[in-house]
Regions:
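Conserved N-terminal Rossmann-fold NAD(P) cofactor-binding segment
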Residues: 68-97
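A short helix->loop->beta-strand "cap" motif at the edges of active sites that frequently abuts
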Residues: 85, 121-123, 148-151
Length: 201
């Protein structure tokens, strides 16, 4: 077997192996670890992507939710797939796992709780709760903390679908686009405005 170094920007840790008339691309993946804060529907989608092998370079090592049963459900699903995932009951416990990335899928309040400690921990953040960053003082604190600690905060479109499409339409110049978004009545459960009659409308 002859190993040929492959200097591909797509596969920086790859090399070609030639065996007879066949060539094989061998890739060493630098696995990144991540944790999830908030174990609702979006966290379920992310964890299922791990189970299905759609995120081969990432390992989910811990989950946290104020509702422990939700975190246990995700960790249980990971265990069924032969993957280890810790159920954490505090933010400190989650960050003690020293993840590369924290995926925040909970709420603006959760981002306020996790952002600065995570960034100081050497953990970058992917957040779906961008509303918390509308507070100028908090935004500046997060940016400064990230710079000081060599970490990053990635702002995702979040639970409101269509923002990526709207950004694309904006790049088209004189395009016109309309965006409609509806949430089901279950999204209001546990709030003062929820009424059972909403289920029938």
């Amino acid at each position: 077997m002859t190993a040929l170094l492959c200097l591909s920007s797509l596969f920086p840790f790859s090399f070609m192996v030639k065996h007879g008339n066949r060539k094989y691309l061998c890739t060493f993946v630098n696995m990144k670890t991540f944790v999830i804060a908030g174990c609702g529907r979006l966290a379920g989608i992310v964890s299922e992507a791990v189970v299905k092998g759609l995120l081969p370079e990432y390992e989910l090592v811990g989950v946290y939710s104020r509702t422990v049963a939700k975190a246990e459900r995700i960790a249980g699903r990971m265990a069924e797939a032969g993957k280890s995932c810790a159920v954490c009951t505090t933010a400190d416990e989650l960050l003690a796992l020293k993840p590369d990335i924290l995926v925040e899928t909970a709420s603006p309040a959760a981002l306020r709780e996790f952002a600065v400690p995570a960034l100081k921990n050497g953990t970058s953040i992917v957040t779906l709760s961008i509303g918390a960053l509308a507070d100028d003082a908090f935004y500046r604190e997060v940016c400064e903390t990230a710079k000081e600690n060599g970490t990053r905060i990635y702002i995702a479109s979040g639970a409101t679908g269509g923002f990526d499409v709207l950004r694309t339409a904006a790049l088209m110049g004189k395009a016109t686009a309309r965006f409609y978004n509806e949430k089901g009545p279950d999204a209001l459960k546990g709030t003062p405005v929820y009424e059972e009659a909403l289920q029938k409308e």
